[in-house]
Amino acid sequence: GAHPISPYIYSLSSKFGHLADKDRNEIKEQLDPSASGGMNGYISLCGGDPSPLVFRSPVDGLEDIMDNQVICSIYKRSRSSQLRNGKVSRRRAPASGAARVLRREGAEREGCSDTRCRCRRRRRRVQGYGVAGLASCDAPHDPDAPHGTDAPHTPDAPYGSDSPATGNHYGYQYHYRPGGGASGGPCSPMIISTCTVYVPRS
């Protein structure tokens, strides 16, 4: 069947279809949500016939539409969106299991100064420039135990021969691990951010 908004378009076309395109663009008619399937806003006329019987194909080689059933108009939003009369908006609730709460365990003892931080952070010093790899596990683990073997713990090792003679460079990886760990459940792959700290020699 026809869309409930089609009578509005035909009515608008019969009233103002004879105007020039410039004048037609200034005309708009407000929609009745109860009569237009819940649509708020305004409609305006397109240029030309809103529902031509023959619709020319825009692609070379394809046949024209000889029995067009499509009606066209321009939709303009209203300034303030509103629900239909009698419609009650439901309160948005999170889907079950859609997201895991990030914990704040250990943030204070690890020196996290951001009071909004809701993550558990581990810091380890590793050799080399750049991220050594994405550490993850699929089983319960000790949050204070070494996490993976892709980046060895080297507390006092400098970066190498390119280190300045006046000090050593160390890389620190910060592991943001959502959920798991201390609760006994498996942890998700961690997001690793790396920074470089220059330690002067005493």
Swiss-Prot record:
Residues 137-166 are annotated as: Disordered. InterPro entries: Xrn1_helical. It holds the Pfam family XRN_M. Contains several arginine residues in close proximity which may be involved in protein RNA interactions. This is Cold-regulated protein 2.
